[in-house]
């Protein structure tokens, strides 16, 4: 374990960050399956790059201009996903031989894609046949699903496969229990899962094809404009000077970057390679440093407006505009990051940590100079929120804006590095910027296509899970079981649903995670009488926090790998830091006004915001054991109780919580005054 440095050592752009840069790829390969891709070089790399870029362009064109029916568009899309998937993801992370595509991968790629293309080209026939599909169609469906399962194992992981596998087995059991022959049971299940919009080509993959892929491509373009470095520099300038500044930098930068990246593990590694070494050098323990980055990166998935692309799925499932989903997510996200921010501040005060010297921080002048980098994101938010364009067209316009911003950035970078300014230098800079921009555009399209593979496969598997639940009526069984267990104690029902969400969400990507929660857990809460929007936000939050909840806390383990800390301790610390995510969903389940539902007055919203922020502050202080000075266990417990009381809806509970928290602060002020007078 790394030795904790002197807490009074000034923090600079840490040398540790350079020392661990070589380990980043290794950590990504270990904890993020999206990074376990084949190695291509030379001509093969060019061919693959062109294919992936062309696939991304095809996705954009199909989304914007195709009017074909879903049974044609979606199987065709999945056919290309299978081709791209086996080209990029080897059978094992140990198969890293450059330019090597084994015969069995070629076979799987061709057969699997062929199954989906067959469906696409014969869609009208399959629709007319309906449940009268022939044995050859059953074989094609079985092979297509098996190939999809193998691709899922490679690029998504085992947890979602285990859930899907158990549900498919249960679906067979359910069919056979009606004295159906094995073939008839297989035929019924394959028809439902492969040939209808209740399975592989169901709502999840439809939303993925229509919206999510474009936003993934937009995110890839945005990242290559240098916006991640801008976010980190902005966070550094804003909070780096304060006590424990690097941890606050991690919170802000990870929230902004994670919102765009859509991967808690990937964001933990990329921003963590910079922030975690700085936190350690400031004086934070390695377990705490890794936990801060993991908790903040996971929070990026609930950060509006993009919310790791899950907002688009939520809008589809709930049946409200995307812009309203983003607005409803604002207050819970503020509470989440406020809780983390307060925790790292109090930890820094408790340890007496310093920040970064102001003369080593980025200059406001330089940040203002580069603020044009966020214009594509601003354009996207404006187009979507104003309703001026559809979400697909908004993403397309934002991609074009990102290309223009990237071109400007390349040009300005070349001009700034030029020794002399002249017309000739300007012409060269323009030519170089055009070349750089073209290369960056191809790289962005390739990266976007790669990112789309994992999300599309996960959404397809989520469609299978939803289809199995529909075929078997399992949702009703699960709902009735939890309702009976909970009885009239609705809080027990929330606890049981929370446990289900965390278990089902372990190791599952954000988009597929929400699809599973919306199909299995949200109906439970709706049946118990909770509002539709609150139910979906509740299950979404607890599905996401599985990434930092031991034992399968992938984001926390990725953070611990960079921090060189104990993984389990890092996971526990991350859970403590993200305590708001475990409390707030219960609050908006009982008080939907926190999601701006059924709000009757501005005063009501103001009261909710102020008391919720004070409540999160008190809970975080109780967990950290510090407000103005260290607290003993009795005061810590009292602070948590006061915070929870503030979070409970109602004026009386708010007043009780205020009295408790004010009493603790007054007591600490008196203790500090007494100590000063004694000195």
Residue ranges with predicted function:
Residues 2, 6-46, 327-451, 554-644, ...:
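Long, contiguous bundles of hydrophobic transmembrane helices that form the permeation core
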Residues 219-223, 254-263, 295-301, 462-466, ...:
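Transmembrane alpha-helix interface/packing and boundary motifs in multi-pass membrane proteins
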């Amino acid at each position: 374990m790394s030795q904790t440095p002197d807490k009074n050592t000034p923090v600079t752009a840490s040398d540790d960050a350079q020392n661990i840069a070589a380990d980043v790829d290794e950590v990504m390969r270990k904890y993020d399956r999206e990074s376990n891709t084949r190695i291509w070089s030379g001509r093969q790399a060019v061919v693959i790059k062109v294919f992936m870029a062309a696939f991304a362009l095809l996705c954009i064109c199909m989304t914007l201009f195709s009017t074909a029916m879903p049974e044609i568009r979606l199987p065709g899309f999945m056919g290309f996903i299978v081709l791209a998937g086996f080209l990029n993801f080897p059978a094992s992370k140990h198969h890293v031989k450059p330019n090597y595509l084994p015969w069995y991968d070629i076979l799987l790629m061709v057969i699997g894609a062929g199954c989906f293309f067959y469906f696409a080209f014969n869609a009208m026939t399959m629709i007319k046949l309906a449940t009268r599909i022939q044995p050859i169609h059953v074989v094609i469906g079985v092979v297509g699903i098996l190939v999809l399962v193998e691709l899922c194992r490679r690029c998504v992981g085992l947890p979602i496969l285990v859930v899907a596998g158990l549900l498919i087995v249960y679906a067979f059991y359910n069919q056979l229990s009606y004295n159906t022959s094995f073939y008839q049971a297989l035929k019924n299940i394959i028809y439902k899962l492969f040939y209808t919009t209740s399975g592989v080509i169901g709502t999840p993959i439809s939303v993925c094809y229509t919206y999510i892929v474009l936003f993934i491509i937009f995110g890839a373009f945005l990242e290559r404009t240098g916006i991640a470095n801008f976010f980190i520099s902005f966070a550094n300038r804003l909070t780096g000077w304060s006590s424990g500044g690097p941890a606050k930098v991690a919170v802000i930068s990870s929230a902004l970057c994670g919102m765009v990246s859509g991967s808690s593990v990937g964001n933990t590694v990329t921003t963590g390679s910079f922030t975690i070494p700085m936190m350690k050098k400031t004086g934070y323990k390695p377990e705490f440093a890794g936990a801060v980055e993991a908790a903040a990166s996971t929070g990026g998935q609930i950060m509006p407006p993009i919310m790791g692309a899950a907002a688009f799925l939520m809008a589809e499932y709930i049946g409200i505009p995307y812009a309203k989903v983003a607005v409803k997510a604002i207050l819970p996200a503020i509470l989440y990051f406020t809780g983390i921010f307060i925790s790292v501040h109090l930890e820094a005060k408790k340890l007496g940590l310093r920040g970064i010297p102001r003369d080593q921080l980025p200059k406001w002048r330089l940040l203002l100079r580069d603020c044009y980098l966020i214009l594509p994101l601003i354009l996207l938010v404006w187009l979507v929120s104003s309703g001026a364009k559809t979400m697909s067209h908004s993403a397309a316009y934002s991609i074009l804006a990102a290309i223009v911003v990237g071109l400007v950035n390349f040009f300005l970078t070349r001009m700034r590095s030029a020794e002399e300014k002249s017309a000739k230098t300007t012409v060269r800079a323009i030519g170089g910027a055009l070349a750089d921009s073209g290369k960056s555009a191809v790289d962005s399209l390739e990266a976007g296509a790669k990112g789309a593979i994992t999300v599309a496969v996960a959404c397809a598997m989520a469609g299978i899970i939803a289809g199995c639940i529909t075929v078997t009526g399992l949702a009703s069984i699960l709902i009735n079981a939890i309702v009976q267990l909970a009885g009239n104690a609705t809080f027990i029902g929330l606890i049981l649903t929370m446990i289900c969400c965390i278990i089902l969400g372990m190791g599952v990507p954000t988009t597929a995670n929400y699809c599973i929660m919306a199909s299995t857990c949200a109906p439970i809460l709706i049946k118990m009488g909770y509002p539709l929007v609150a139910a979906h936000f509740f299950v979404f939050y607890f599905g996401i926090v599985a990434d930092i909840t031991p034992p399968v806390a992938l984001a926390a383990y990725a953070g611990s790998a960079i921090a060189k800390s104990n993984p389990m301790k890092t996971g526990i610390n991350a859970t403590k830091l993200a305590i708001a995510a475990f409390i707030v969903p219960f609050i908006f389940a009982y008080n939907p006004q926190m999601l701006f539902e059924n709000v009757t007055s501005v005063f009501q919203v103001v009261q909710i915001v102020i008391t919720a922020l004070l409540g999160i502050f008190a809970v975080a202080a109780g967990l950290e054991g510090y407000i103005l000075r260290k607290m003993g266990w009795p005061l810590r417990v009292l602070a948590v109780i006061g915070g929870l009381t503030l979070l409970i809806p109602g004026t009386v509970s708010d007043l009780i919580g205020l009295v408790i928290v004010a009493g603790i602060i007054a007591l600490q002020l008196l203790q500090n005054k007494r100590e000063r007078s004694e000195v």
